[in-house]
Amino acid sequence: MSVQSTIRRKTAPDIRARKGGDPIVMLTSYHAHTASLVDRYCDAILVGDSLGNVMHGFETTVPVTLEMMILQGHAVMRGSQHALVVVDMPFGSYEASKEQAFHSAARILKETHCGAVKLEGGVRMAETIRFLTERGIPVMGHIGLTPQSINTLGSFRAQGREEGSWEPIEADAKAVAEAGAFSVVVEAVAEPLGRKITETIAIPTIGIGASAACDGQVLVLEDMLGLSPKPPKFVKRYGDLGPGIEAAIKGYAEEVRSRAFPGPEHVYGMKSKA
């Protein structure tokens, strides 16, 4: 006899059903502690490969490994109860073949217990998305600016801002939707294009630097908390935690050096004899 939790976690079909409804709220998290905070207010938590930048100081997401994603995905699952947890498939874990993608995605789901995976690419990845979804793996797509392709893009620049540049991105959105993805992240595209894609495809769009018309929004948690020194244009800072954290560390260092910490209230005395 198994013991089932009475708390119901959101699923990929729940997010899919939100098309055209209340906006979907999503943030990134890589730790159990932040996941528990994000979980209170968000519909979905993205364990993004942006952890390579945020946690490890990489310049791009390319060096991130499958093992890194699984480790942090498991942490986020332990820290959350309600939100759908989506784990990024890192560069090199799914592009070679749809079979490679299945084995990587299956590992992520089995070892983290998350509810879905996310992968980058539109038309070129449609066959893989279909292969995964037909085999029981919920997939969130990612089009527009695709950071894992930085070495071919050359820079992290917004997409679809020139005349005649919309068609490939629109084709990507359509391909991802028709392949069976339950939603798609639309990153750093011209606002009118983000709006048009949202109006055109049947699955929810989750914007990041796209349009307020998208079916939902996502940001990197550390960016919106003010912990990133140079966040992208599309980030709104809802907090300024950086200076506060620095002040706390400075205060701690000063008190340790002056022997003001630990004080009497922070140490243990001897037990009195009975």
From Swiss-Prot:
It holds the Pfam family Pantoate_transf. Pathway: Cofactor biosynthesis; (R)-pantothenate biosynthesis; (R)-pantoate from 3-methyl-2-oxobutanoate: step 1/2. GO terms for cellular component: cytoplasm. It is an enzyme of class 2 (transferase). Its EC number is 2.1.2.11. It catalyses: 3-methyl-2-oxobutanoate + (6R)-5,10-methylene-5,6,7,8-tetrahydrofolate + H2O = 2-dehydropantoate + (6S)-5,6,7,8-tetrahydrofolate. Mg(2+) binds at residues 49, 88, 120. 3-methyl-2-oxobutanoate binds at residues 49-50, 88, 118. Its cofactor is Mg(2+). Keywords: Cytoplasm, Magnesium, Metal-binding, Pantothenate biosynthesis, Transferase. The active site is at residue 187. SUPFAM superfamilies: Phosphoenolpyruvate/pyruvate domain. One of its GO terms (biological process) is pantothenate biosynthetic process. InterPro entries: Pantoate_hydroxy_MeTrfase, Pyrv/PenolPyrv_kinase-like_dom, Pyrv_kinase-like_dom_sf. Binds 1 Mg(2+) ion per subunit. It is found in: Cytoplasm. One of its GO terms (molecular function) is magnesium ion binding. It comes from the Bacteria. Belongs to the PanB family. NCBIfam families: panB, PRK00311.1. Homodecamer; pentamer of dimers. Catalyzes the reversible reaction in which hydroxymethyl group from 5,10-methylenetetrahydrofolate is transferred onto alpha-ketoisovalerate to form ketopantoate. This is 3-methyl-2-oxobutanoate hydroxymethyltransferase. It comes from Rhodopseudomonas palustris (strain TIE-1). The gene is panB.
